[in-house]
Regions:
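Short acidic, S/G/P-rich loop/turn micro-motifs used as interaction or catalytic elements
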Residues: 12-16, 37, 41-48, 71-73
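Hydrophobic/aromatic interaction determinants used to assemble and anchor large protein complexes
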Residues: 8, 29-44, 61
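AAA+ P-loop ATPase motor domain of ring mechanoenzymes
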Residues: 1-15, 23-25, 62-285, 290-431
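Conserved Walker B catalytic segment
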Residues: 21-24, 44-59, 300, 304
């Protein structure tokens, strides 16, 4: 041991009830050699365990350092017999992250630009950067391997509160008006060229908040909101997570804010995109404060607005009822995309697009009358086509119009609608 260094004893605490026995075992050593004690608090620490922690430390004369996540610091400090000294350690900034990538990566693996891209996309701690490099090195290490490893490392925590969505769709799968496709292109550029805008072109000196991408996708069910979010994330090379609002909202005061804080922190660190599906459940019109419950609900929404404005990643909100969102909330979004029900020409594209090229179609299969007659969303058309394909496969035949009509009856029956005889005129006449 170097002269002047204080010896330390590290205790990785699993259960608060174990601390008394663990301290008793090291008490003699701390008195004999003046060792300090480092107590590592687990991630699943409960606030009520903090009182037990300080009871167990009663009578310990050695210096004690408690290492914990920021979310547990307040509860531990509140129960302390006297005000403890608190040192907050944040994640390294962009410059430091770039230096860490450069130091830890072997020479010649990545260009300086690629290293800077990793540093900008993933707000990792030094430990997470090291784990990413080790994980990528299992195979041939390179840019693609490092990004894949970084996404895997970063998603470990966020996947506990949100559901990863597969990114199987491409831009060719979208059937949307040209104006909406143009907005999608701009949304992709919003993230792809963020560093150029804020760093190279100097907008960072003028704009402190709202540097991320916040988008509201509004429209009836099945009109392509989730698919568009998946295409956007895929084009940007980001993982996409759908937020389960039932796991975010809580009846206990302060818990919803805590859940939202964890969600945004993990998404920011991992570079993942967030999709709040059916968001009207959480983001409804703010009420006038008539009682304590209303005031608390407004505080929750206010905190969400604050985190969205501070977030530098991608946050997409999908709702079926845009009218339930007030103007103050709408102003926080960079993009407002209204997904309409498809007209006859778009419905024909959807009917044709839902049938893969590999499907064996009947030679006389005419989808025009179905598209012209039935006002369906893309999701409903998908369900009709899929049911028809199963019927044809079960019969050992090609897909015929009667299969599609039977699939159509099943789909319309879900909402009590009636199948009428298809119009035998072209879609061009319809539009």
């Amino acid at each position: 041991m170097k002269k002047g260094c204080t010896p330390t004893i590290s205790i990785a605490l699993d259960k608060p009830n174990d601390l008394g026995a663990r301290l008793l075992a090291v008490r003699h050593e701390t008195r004999w050699n003046g060792a300090g004690i480092i107590i590592q608090i687990p991630e699943d620490w409960r606030a009520r365990d903090s009182a037990l922690l300080w009871i167990a430390l009663t009578g310990i004369d050695a210096p004690v350092a408690i290492v914990t996540l920021a979310e547990h610091a307040d509860s531990i400090a509140i129960h302390a017999p006297e005000e403890p000294m608190t040192v907050a350690l944040g994640r390294p900034d962009l410059v430091r992250r770039a230096q860490l990538w450069q130091t830890l990566l072997p020479d010649g693996v990545l260009s300086a630009g690629d290293r800077d891209e990793l540093a900008a996309r993933y707000e990792f701690s030094p430990r997470a950067i090291s784990r990413t490099i080790r994980r990528a090195a299992v195979d041939r290490i390179g840019k693609a391997e490092l990004h894949a490893a970084a996404r895997a490392i970063g998603s470990a925590n966020i996947s506990t509160i949100a559901q990863p969505l597969p990114l199987v769709y491409t831009r060719d799968d979208l059937v949307l008006p040209p104006r909406m496709l143009g907005e999608l292109d701009l949304a992709i550029a919003w993230i792809r060229y963020k560093r150029k805008i804020y760093d190279t072109w100097g907008f960072g000196r003028r704009i402190a908040l709202g540097r991320g991408l916040t988008a509201l996708f509004a429209g009836p069910p099945g009109t392509g909101k989730t698919m568009t979010a998946q295409v956007l994330a895929r084009d940007l090379g980001l993982d996409l997570y759908r937020v389960d609002l039932s796991r975010v909202m809580s009846k206990y005061i302060g818990e919803t804010e805590k859940n939202l804080s964890k969600l945004f922190d993990e998404a920011q660190a991992s570079g993942a995109a967030l999709l709040f599906d059916e968001a009207d459940a959480l983001f409804g019109k703010r009420s006038e404060s008539r009682d304590a419950h209303d005031r608390y609900a407004n505080l929750e929404i206010g905190y969400l607005l604050q985190r969205m404005e501070e977030h530098e990643g991608v946050a997409i909100l999908a709702t079926n009822r845009v009218g339930d969102l007030d103007e103050a909330f709408l102003r926080r979004f960079h993009f407002l995309l209204d997904f309409p029900m498809p007209d006859a020409s778009y419905r024909l594209r959807l009917w044709n697009g839902m049938l893969p090229r590999e499907v064996d179609r009947a030679p006389d299969l005419d989808l025009g009358p179905l598209a012209a007659t039935y006002e369906l969303s893309g999701g409903e058309i998908r369900n009709c086509v899929l049911a028809a394909a199963y019927m044809a496969a079960a019969e050992g035949t090609c897909v015929r119009i009667d299969h599609l009509e039977r699939g159509l009856r099943r789909e319309l029956g879900k909402t009590g609608r009636i199948v009428v005889a298809p119009r035998r005129r072209s879609v061009e006449e319809e539009v």
